[in-house]
């Protein structure tokens, strides 16, 4: 089974944070609310079709979570499994890992052609959280993938605002500015566009549509319950 299919093939695997939380429930006993949460977990991690949870179900989840969609595959749910400083590792039920930093996908583990490395993240315009500065910025980076274009391909990115949208997340509206990132990979000069929905109040990325490299599928990710340290 290829990695793209594995993203939505919900089997018996649970991320470590979920296993730890479930173990705590076994030690402390289950109330009505925790029983409801366990039922939600069973629904999420064994459902084979597109995942769509109600606002109530999402509120019952005790950890950061996000919807993710890879190419034309059905929507899946990922939960926050690891935190390493500003780097957040989101895991699907069968172990595919999507790693973000400041709302950008910077690495994957378990896809057919993983993004292994993305350089110069300290200069990433998404770190700035200043919408008035983004359109005038250019970001130069270097990327490596596991199967093709494996070593140090230069990328350049330009930015512009393309609109505004109010996102409804767990019944709460977030006013966002949509930023288009136009990426060019050298030396092939292959181009593609990424999109980031940035919260006008907090500066957080609430949603992304990001292509991780030439000829790779677009990954759409909507942050439902963001991580807070």
Model-derived regions: residue spans:
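C-terminal motif of bacterial Sec signal peptides marking the signal peptidase cleavage site
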Residues: 26-29
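Bacterial N-terminal signal peptides that target proteins for export
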Residues: 2-20
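Surface-exposed beta-loop interaction hotspot
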Residues: 125-126
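C-terminal partner/receptor-binding element of secreted or periplasmic proteins
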Residues: 129-135
């Amino acid at each position: 089974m290829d990695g793209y299919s594995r993203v939505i093939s919900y089997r018996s695997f649970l991320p470590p944070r979920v296993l730890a939380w479930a173990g705590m429930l076994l030690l402390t006993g289950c109330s009505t609310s925790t029983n409801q949460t366990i039922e939600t977990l069973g629904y999420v991690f064994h459902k084979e079709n597109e995942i769509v949870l109600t606002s109530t179900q999402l509120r019952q989840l005790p950890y950061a979570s996000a919807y993710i969609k890879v190419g034309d595959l059905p929507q899946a749910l990922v939960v926050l499994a690891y935190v390493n400083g500003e780097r957040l590792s989101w895991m699907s039920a069968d172990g595919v890992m999507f790693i973000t930093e400041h709302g950008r996908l910077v690495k994957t583990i378990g896809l057919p052609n993983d993004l292994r490395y993305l350089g110069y993240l300290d200069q990433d315009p998404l770190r700035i959280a200043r919408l008035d500065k983004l359109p005038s910025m250019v970001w130069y980076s270097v990327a490596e993938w596991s199967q093709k274009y494996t070593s140090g391909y230069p990328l350049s990115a330009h930015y512009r605002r393309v609109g505004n949208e109010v996102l409804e997340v767990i019944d709460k509206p977030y006013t966002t500015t949509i930023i288009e990132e136009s990426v060019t990979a050298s030396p092939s000069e292959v181009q593609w566009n990424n999109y980031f929905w940035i919260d006008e109040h907090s500066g957080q990325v609430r949603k992304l549509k990001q292509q991780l490299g030439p000829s790779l599928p677009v990954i759409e990710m909507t942050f439902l319950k963001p991580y807070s340290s």
